[in-house]
Amino acid sequence: DVVTTGECRIVHKDFCDILLCTKAYFEEKEVGFYKKMQHTGYLRHLLVRRAVKTGEILLDLITTTQIGVEEEKELLAGWLERLLALPLEGKMAGILHTKNDSLADAVKDEGTEVLYGKDYFFEELLGLKFRISPFSFFQTNSLGAEVLYEKTREYVGETKGKVVFDLYSGTGTIAQILAPVAEKVVGVEIVK
């Protein structure tokens, strides 16, 4: 299913501008969306991440491999040109292309190519700087996360001379935020 909007109050305007530009470009080129019941089509997902504090933007276009290599190269070059011409408030850190022929509707990385810039961006939380890739588990609302983590510090209480365990630590944001005020912090995460 294709869900689109020209305006959304819960995301930065750059998200909508990128979405509308991408949608218009591929419609002009008559490139179809992926139809999961028929397993046909090219465009699967558009992942857009934007750092609140740094303003850096990372894009990842997830597609099938249902068009030829040369046609795809030309198609993506045109899309890249359009994106880089957009008057965004943020700074484009990277534009990626991920291939995914999986039958599942989830984004599965079956090969990612950097089309522009780098495959990560930086965000800051409570004075700490985090490097975030397209598939990193990281809070999408950085300002809300800061409030949440401040509350976590309050609940944890006095940590001087104590070892703190951050279970299900993900990228380790809570562990890193508690590290300066504890003797030792251990982050535990299972990655399969």
Which ranges hold each PLM region?
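Accessory RNA-recognition modules of RNA-modification enzymes
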Residues: 1-192
